[in-house]
């Protein structure tokens, strides 16, 4: 037993040593945001695309630390903006993880792919789960699919509902996310109801969520809510109350306009209050 423990501890120490020794001076400078030191190292000929044993690049480290000036310097020197770690993590994913809109913008301006492959960690899902609505907006503006569906995670909207990040939920809905699309048969409304998050439940219903949708257990959202909770009570009242005609008309108009043309609503010959209403402003 003692020999086994000794071997395990030895391996841990070796792994830690490899990690430390595998980090380059560029990694250290990027991690600490030391721009002058980083530039000097680049001028000395250090490879900006050097990676650790886990394929972590200096650009990964700079973005994780929200060091946008270091990220710019690395990219200007030829750093690969789409480099991935052994886990498939990109610098853009790291930027979205910490809510660094500046780093995300720099990466996207220099060719970073706004959307991951299905089997890779997804920047828009990460931003949605962390409540980083600025990154969500940036990714969508650069072409990320607002309804990007990853089998084990669902859509960004579903992820935001599970994490109870109302600002991200609102941003995704305003950008045209499908309010019915969640994970498998579970809708975003089911997720919000299960979390007893009445504010998100109200928001989803405002955008036309189906209160009668059934999940894989054949439950409606009201049945998925915790018993005797505020959300359960709200949904029971909502089910028994006729919806305003204005709300139904807004949903119908937005459906007809289509997500790709939402930006044209501002150009419709309508009074400003009505245009604002159609855009949930």
State each model region's role.
Residues 207, 212-281:
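Cullin-RING E3 adaptor/co-adaptor recruitment helices
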Residues 21, 53-54, 86-87, 119-120, ...:
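Ankyrin repeat start-site detector
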């Amino acid at each position: 037993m003692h020999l086994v423990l000794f071997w395990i501890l030895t391996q841990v120490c070796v792994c830690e040593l490899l990690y430390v020794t595998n980090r380059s001076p560029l990694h250290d400078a990027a991690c600490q945001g030391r721009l002058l030191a980083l530039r000097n190292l680049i001028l000395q000929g250090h490879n900006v695309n050097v990676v650790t044993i886990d394929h972590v690049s200096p650009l990964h480290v700079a973005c994780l630390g929200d060091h946008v000036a270091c990220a710019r310097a690395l990219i200007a020197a030829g750093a690969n903006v789409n480099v991935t770690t052994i886990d498939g993590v990109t610098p853009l994913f790291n930027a979205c993880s910490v809510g660094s809109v500046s780093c995300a913008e720099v990466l996207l301006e220099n060719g970073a792919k706004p959307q991951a492959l299905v089997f890779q960690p997804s920047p828009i899902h990460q931003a949605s789960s962390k409540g980083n609505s600025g990154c969500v907006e940036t990714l969508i503006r650069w072409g990320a699919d607002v309804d990007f569906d990853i089998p084990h995670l669902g859509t960004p909207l579903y992820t935001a509902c599970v994490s109870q990040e109302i600002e991200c939920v609102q941003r995704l809905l305003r950008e045209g996310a499908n309010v019915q699309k969640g994970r498998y048969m579970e809708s975003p409304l089911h997720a919000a109801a299960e979390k007893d998050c009445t504010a998100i439940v109200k928001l989803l219903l405002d955008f036309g969520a189906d209160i009668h949708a059934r999940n894989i257990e054949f439950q409606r959202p009201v049945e998925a809510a915790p018993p005797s909770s505020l959300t359960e009570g709200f949904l029971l009242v909502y089910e028994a109350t006729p919806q305003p005609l204005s709300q139904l008309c807004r949903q119908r108009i937005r459906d007809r306009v289509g997500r790709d043309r939402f930006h044209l609503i501002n150009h419709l010959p309508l009074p400003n209050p009505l245009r604002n209403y159609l855009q949930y402003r």
